Structures are given as C-alpha cells and as structure tokens.
Curated annotation (Swiss-Prot):
Gene3D superfamilies: Immunoglobulins (2.60.40.10)
Record region (Disordered): 189-256, 553-574
Residue ranges occupied by any Fibronectin type-III domain in the UniProt entry: 269-370, 374-466, 470-563, 567-661, 665-758, 762-852, 864-951, 952-1045, 1046-1151
Taxonomy of the source species: Eukaryota, Metazoa, Chordata, Craniata, Vertebrata
GO cellular component, one term: Golgi membrane
Subcellular location(s) per record: Golgi apparatus membrane
Name assigned to this protein: Fibronectin type-III domain-containing protein 3a
SMART domains given in the database record: FN3 (SM00060)
Recorded topology in the membrane: Single-pass membrane protein
Record's compositionally biased regions (Basic and acidic residues): 189-201
Transmembrane segments: 1172-1192
Record has Transmembrane as a keyword: yes
Amino acid sequence: MAEHPPLLDTSSIISSEIPLLTSPIVSGDGAQQVILVQVNPGEAFTIRREDGQFQCITGPAQVPMMSPNGSVPTIYVPPGYAPQVIEDNGVRRVVVVPQAPEFHPGGHAVIHRPPHPPLPGFLPLPAMIPPPPRHIYSPVTGAGDMATQYIPQYHTSQMYGDLDTLPAHGRANFRDERSSKTYERLQKKLKDRHGTQKDKLNSPPSSPQKCPSPTSEPNGLTKGQDTAGISTGSTKSKSVGKGKSNSQTDVEIEEKDEETKALEALLSNIAKPVVSDVQARTALLMWSPPSIDVGEDTDKTNIPGVYTYEVMISNTGKDGKYKTVYIGEENKVTVNDLRPATDYHAKVQVECNCVKGSPSEVESFTTMSCEPDAPNLPRITNRTKNSLTLQWKASCDNGSKIHSYLLEWDEGKGNGEFCQCYYGQQKQYRITKLSPAMGYTFRLAAKNDMGMSGFSEEVLYHTSGTAATTPASPLLINAGVTWLSLQWTKPSGTPSDEGISYILEMEDENSGYGFKPKYDGDDLTYTVKNLRRSTKYKFRVIAYNSEGKSSPSETVDYTTCPDKPGAPSKPSVKGKIHAQSFKIIWDPPKDNGGAAINTYVVEISEGSNGNKWDTIYSGAAREHLCDRLNPGCSYRLRVYCIGEGGQSMASDSLLVQTPAVVPGPCQPPRLQGRPRAREIQLRWGPPQVDGGSPITCYGLEMFQTETDEHREVYQGSDVECTVGSLLPGRMYNFRLRAANKAGFGPYSEKCEITTAPGPPDQCKPPQVTCRSAACAQVSWEVPVSNGADVTEYRLEWGGMEGCMQISYCGPGLNCEMKGLLPATIYYCRVQAVNVAGAGPFSEVVACMTPASVPAVVTCLRGLSEDEVESPHYYPSTCLALSWEKPCDHGSEITGYSIDFGDKQPITVGKVLSYFIDGLQPDTTYRIRIQALNSLGAGPFSHTIKLKTKPLPPDPPRLECVAYSSQTLKLKWGEGTAKALTDSIQYHLQMEDKNGRFVSLYRGPCHTYKVQRLSESTSYKFCIQACNEAGEGPLSQEYVFTTPKSVPAALKAPRIERINDHTCEITWEVLQPMKGDPVIYCLQVMVGKDSEFKQIYKGPDWSFRYTGLQLNCEYRFRACAIRQCQETSGHQDLIGPYSSPVLFISQRTEPPTSTNKDTVQTTRTQWSQSDQVCAAVILALFAIFSILIAVIIQYFVIK
C-alpha cells in the first residue's frame, strides 16, 4: 500500500459468523504500545469498538491500535483463512493465509510462541489518533501477509510458553497459486523453527535489529518492564543450546544481512523528484518508486510492494540544511508555505522494512513572484486641529518591487466604509481640512507588478481638540523612607491617540512655599525622591495638551515611611562579674528613625573571635542578667533594636571575661612502659574540670612507703615525666595535682610503683699495655653489679673515638688485640652486662703503638715523555718513574731504593719522581721500589715493566716526481704497503719569502703535492722522520723549480662565408703572458682526411681561407703559442687546441640556397655554443675539486 492511512469511516456491522482470533493473555504490567495494522486493497479488517459493536474497515487503510495492558488485540479473519504467528530473525509476523486440508486433519494446529513479548493489547479506537513512529511499520512482503510493521520490534530476554492451540476454520482449497506458494514457504519456516524455539525461550533474538525502538517511544520496551507470559500449555524453560540450532541461526543471520544489503541497494536506486505546478507559495513534487530489473527467474514475491518516502527541501543551497516536509507512501506531494521568489532544492529518500536507502539527486526550482505582504499599520508623526501626518514602512515585496501605496480612510464617519485617501510612491502623507477633536480610521495596502496586497490593520487617530479635562487625584503605589511612588490616570473622555502631558505638584507644609512642580511629562507614574522620613506631603496633578491646561486634581496626603533606628550604645557591665553570671545595661539609640523603639535584642558569642551569635534576650527593658556561663571564658555581647522602620545595626560588642576557679582533681598518674631499675616514666592527663582557665602546671609528689617522706619530683606543663635517681627493687608512691592561674587544685589518689633490678655500674677505665707495634694487652676490673651478677664484658676498640666496634665479648677481665698498625692511636672502652641489661661504658682510654718501618709504596707508574720537563731526558735511554708517598709508621721517610734488574739498586732522596738514564734503547726493564726510614727499609712495591723507545730515524731522500707551472709533487722513502703501516711520521717543510721553513705536511704518507705555486720559480724543501722515540734530524735542502705555463685553450673559432670558395676564420685573442708574446696556429681537416694540417701560424687573430671546394666538409681548430725568451734560446709553449668547427661550402643559389646556408650557419653556432657550455661546466667542476682538496689538506691532514 502506498497511501496515507485514511480516517476510519463507519461501516456496516459484520455478522457474528465471522471467526474471531483469540490471543493469549500476558501477565505483568505491560507498557502502553501502538500497533499499526495494515489492510491491503480488496480486503477488510474488523475491530470491536468501545460500545461492543463490530466495525469493518476495508482496504487500503492503516489502523493504529493501542494496548495499555500487554494483551493482543482481537482480530477477525474472513472465512477460509487462519492467522499464524511466526518468528523471522527476531521479528514477529502475524500472517493470514488460506487453510490447507492437510493442515487440520482433525486436531488443532499448535503454533509455538516466539521468544518475544506478545502483541500489544486492544484499546477503544479514537476518532483521531496520531500516526505511529516511522520505524514501526514497513511494506507488506506478500499477499495476505501482515508485515512486520504490525509488531513493534524490540529486544527482550524473557521466557514465554507455547501458544494455545488454534481452531481451524474455513475452506480446504487455496484461492490461487500465489497464495499456495506463500503458504508453503511460511509453513516450512514454521516447521524448521518448531524444534529450535523451545531451546531459545530464555535468549534474546539472534538477528541484529535494523531499526530498534528507543525506550521513550510508545512501542519501546522500558527498562525493568515485566513481560513474562502465561500460556495454557506447559511452560518450558531451557537454556540456549549448541549445535544444530545455533548453526542454523547463524546461516539465517547471514541470509538476512544479504537480503538487507540487497534491499538497501534497491532503495538507493531512485530518481530525483520532478517539480511541476510551481506557484508563489506552493509546488507539486512527484517521484517514481525505486527501479528494479525483474528477470524471468526473479521471485516477484520478494519485491517490496510498499515504500515509505521522505521528502526534504532546502532554501540554503544544495549543501545546506534540509528539512522534512513529507513522510508517507504517496508518490507525490504538494509543498505549501513556501516563500515567493526563492530558490529551493528537493530530494527524496526511500524506506522499507526499517531500511533506508541513499537520498536521490537534488532537484532545484524557484517559486513565482506574487503581490506584496500586507504592510504594517501607518503611524502618526504629527497632529493638529485640522491635519494628521501619517508615515509607514515598506513591506516584503515578494520578488517584485513595490511601486505604489494605497491609503484609505473612513472620512470620520465610523461606518466601516473606506475610500481612497492617497495613492502614490511616497511613504508618508498629510491629510488636511479635518475637524478638531475628530476620530479618523485608516488602513494601508501596497502594490507591485503582481497585484495589490491585503490591507493592514485598521487604526484610529484623532485630531487635536479642546484643552484637557481635570484628571483624578494621584494614587500611592509604594512608599519608602525618602521617596513616594505615585500613579495617575488619563482624564476620562480623552481620545486614545491624543497626546497629553502631566504636571505633578507637591506641597511640603514645613517649607511654607506651597505647591511646587515635581514632574512634567507624558508618563502616568513618577517617584518623588529626596524626601524626609515620617513626613506628610500633599500632591495634586494637572493635565495639559496643545490646547491648554486642566484644573488641578483634588489634593491627597501621603506620608513617607520611618527609617530604621540607629544602633544602641555599647553595652556595659553592671556590678561584679561572677564566675557564671553578670548583668549588662545599655542606652537607647540616639536616632530612633522617626518612630518609637519596640524591642531590644541581646546576642552573645562565646570566645573572643567567635562568629556564631545566639539570642539570649528580646524585650523592651534595657538591662539583662547573663547567667549559666562557664568560668574563665570570654564572651562578646551586642545589642540591636527594632522599630517601625525596621531593624537597626548591631552595637559595638562588649568583651567580658568571667573569672576562673582552681581546677578539679586529676586522675592518678599511670606507668608508661615497664619500670626500670633507676627510673620510672609516668604519664597523666588533664583534669575533667579546668576551672575556666588553661592548665599551666602540674605538680608530681613522691614518697616511700617505709619513710613516708614526701618530695615533689616534678613541676611543669608536660603530661609526662621520668623520675630518676631511684633505687632498684624499691616501692614508691606518687600523686598529682593541676594548677591554672587561679592556683593549684586538690591532689589525686596515690599510685604505687616498684622499680626493677638495674644493670651494673660503670666500669673503671681499662688498662692498655703495648707488647709490640702490632699487639696490645687490655685489662679491666669488676664494677658494682646492682643486685645481679655480671655475665659478660664488652670491649669496644677503634682508630677513632666516635667510631669504635666491639672487639671482645665474654666473661674474662682481659683481652689481647693483634694486627695493629705501628705509630697509630687507638681508643677503647669497656661495658659490663647482667640479666637486667648492659651498664654504661667506661671512660674512653687512648693508646699509641710504637713506630716501625715504612709501609709499601703505592701507585708506582711510568711517566710519558710529555710529563717529563727535564731537557736531559731521552726516551731511548731513559725511563721516568713516579709514585705516592707511603705511610711512614711513626718515623720520617729518609729516601727510596729503586731496583730495576741485575744492576745495583739506586737510592734517591725524599722525592716522588725520578728518571733512570744510561739505559739501552728498545729494552724492557722490571722496576720496583721501597721506602726507607730510621728503623729500616719497608717492603718492596709491586713490579712494573717499562720499555725504552728505539732511536729516532734518519731523514729520507726527497724527490720531485711530477710538476706543473703551479704544482710540485714530491716523494720520499719507500711507498710500499709495509711502509704505510709503520709508526714513522714525516714532517715536510718549505722555505717562505722570509727565509724561514714552514710546515707543509706531517703524516705517514710518502708523497705530497704542493699547490698554488708561481710559474718559473725555485722553491727549497727539507724533510725529517719521526717515531715514538722522537724527531730525527732535518735533511739537506732540496731545490725544485716550476716550469712556465702554457696558454689556455681558445674558444671555438668563428667562420664567416665570403663567397663560394672563400671564408674567413676568426678566433679568440689572448694577452701576452708575463711579457712573452703569444702567436696563433690554425689547422684544417678537409673531407674524409684523418689529420689536421696547419694553414696559418702568426700573431693575427683572423685568417681568410681560399680554395674551398663545393659541397665539401671543412673542420677548423686553433691554438695559442707562447714564445718564451730563455737565456739558452727561443722556446715555444703550445697550448691546447680549441674544439673543431664544421663548415660545409655550398653554391650560392636563390633564396632557397641562402636558407640552407643560414641553417648550416645556425647549426654551426649551436655546435659552438654547446662546446662553450661544456667547457664552462668542466672548468667549474675543476675549481670545485681543487677547493675540496684544499679544505681536506688544511683541516684534515694538518
């Protein structure tokens, strides 16, 4: 069906012979839901109305039904048809199909309930019901089927039982082949699911929901909703099984997804809408259903028959914001409420079975122009007795410019008949020759090329008339302390459009000046300010217009309100302040605000900085007794008063301190920890009653039971105390009292505490006897044991007084210390221990061991050549040593003995470095050293191996292997691979202009190229070899001379044709080179010759060559020759030849031949230019290579 659901018309009441489909009842509280029942064309749908009668609705139609209690509505089916409820991928479908003979052989067909809530229940159908949400209906998939839009789609996990058996009615034959195929397909689905539904009763639908309903809509399932069902059959509760049922469900899901994709592709294949009948405010949009290619094998029953279309338009461009103007099944719609002369863009989107396709292409159209909108009513700008001036604004022209306005009036008759007053382009008009105090009604219309607009609202204006009448007396709106707000009304009988002004006059009786104006204006209200409080004022009002003033209104009296009173005086104390009470008094405020004071309120706050105020008194008296206070507390009090004008500010606060009393008794002190032998640690808490003052002191008293001698052992503010100087194992009594600024309170009850046995007393200092430099004997005496025998002694020994360690622990009275260092101070002390603990250590005793030979020399090492500053040091025959000074063990070190092999050891003085000379080059020595003092020689140090370096090498022979005018390549030594890996370095030097030799190269290479030299110049060089032994001697001086430079290469010569047998060759001119003249040599190669022949040699830079043969190739090249004048004779230096130039001689002919020569000449010029470019690139590359070589030579090698 592709139409909107029509209104439900009343139809004939069906007979009771039509079978009725009864549905199971659902228990629990069901949510209110909407069911959209679709009736196909040619079919009928029957419902029961509220009055109990039956109504038959013929298709095509859509019937919305509501269910408040979750029950399935009553649905009638025609004879010969039976309804079936099936579950298809999580969606319930109610299908009405013809009955088959084999379907009801004699029993009832049992249809299992799918795992979903049942169909919503039935409610009386109203005359008008809003359409359901778009996502709850979709097109019908076949004849006689109820599509899925009948059933709201939502998830659920509740369990339901089987449906009751349904009675079979109707005919036994099928109506047509299409119905038979539909029935067979649905029956197969029903039988396939019959075995799997029982196992899926407790599981949600396995199919993904394409269009889930939100819980806020009528057909959604709210959270926590009870959807349990009751069935007349047996209720089964099983978990979802595995195996065949699940695999079959997965296959169905995949099939459903493929069907959804195919449907979505079909819905997206829709053409853009067609726009017709475009008017100023309406347009007709039409479109076609999605196109589909139906083949011979295509199942036509799978093609959707009903689509839902959504039409969207936009007036902000194709990519602007679209709004939906239509949703339904029609193929056309008339869009209303459009704006004239506006561009619109429209597109359509198709939906089927809750699946939407892509929107169509955009169709653009423009609405027509039309008459203007009705203008606003004209307003008055000036008014006199005989004229009115009106003005108005232009309205929307709707696409056509407004060219005139029509102003009509009723001529003051008031009968509703209007005639033309003005017609033109102006936007204002002055109407003259009017009557005074007369009302005239006007209306306005605008006109453009499309027609006349509607008239504006009618407006009534009056001309000026007589003077204003007397207004009523002003009324009081509100009153304040210094202001009065008044209001008055317009005089009766005054036209509504007449401009009237008012004068408000006030009289202050105390001033004696009478009435004075306070306001002059058009407003009907005014607030008179700057008045005095509690004062009576008289007011009257006068109205006036352009014709004159009215008489004053009747005089009225109004009084300002009283002000809030001032703050009372600061309260003061009356009489003596007691520990728990005192009396206060206060004076009334100096300013009562213009009215009598009714009440005084006293507030109190505990503490000097408290912010919490409590009311303790409210009355008319001016004194109050504050009682039930705490001793020793600070209180702040303040007073404020209340009058007719309000509440005053609070007075300044009074600070009162109640006197304190002595504190109450404390609890007895208690023992903190375990009792010790000579001291007890006691702890206590403050008393429960502090007397109103902080506890400042505690007093602790002690006495023994035997002597009953009292003694105060502690007085202070702490809550704990350690009582010392006690005897071990004795009983002591203690009692406590607390004190504040008022004095001490009573003592607490006494407590008895017994001391524990104590550790031994402090031992006497031990005695130390040194037996040798590495051994000492320590002994001590037995101390006082304090009631327990000493079980062991602990001896601490160390080289520092504050860092000693226990070296002996045992019952003995002596100990021997071994492994000591000579001439070293040691510290020791001893401690006694018994069962009660360890006693205090004795005083520390210091002793010093006797002196001995020095310790082992450490850090013996060899020095490098750079670390030795002596000029007599030669690494080939000398070895330098250094070491650190060892411990002298109490006797100053007098020297060191160095042992370096079979030779006699060397004795040196008190030095820490020394070099041994007279050694053999390139020889290894084993060296060790020992320190000497007055007591003898110490032990030798560790042995090190040092080797003397070989002798420096001799300088090599220097040779020049290559040269040029600016470079010399020098070579020395053997340049083999073995020599390159040797440790020998070479230092090449050259003499500069000042006669000094400067370094050119230092490194292991055997060749070096000297660059940037001058031509024909002699240079002096020398070289020396270096190795790890040092630098060898310099070689003799070598002199090498650079030759003169040859001229540079010339550019390609230029050839100019003279005639058929003659041409002129021109080449580049070079300047003389350092005084030497330069001549030129020109060569030619004719035809297929392989060698160039000289045709000219001389100083000229051009040559005319004759004897050219026609159609023959000639190649010319030139070079420069430097003529050097040497002492030995004349010498020519020939430079490189230029690149050859090709020239072809041809006969002079008409313009065609000339063109050929031109082409050949152009080709020759191009060849010359290419050669020049190649030469420039080559020169730049050479310069760049030289620059890189210089940088490497300067920064890397040096």
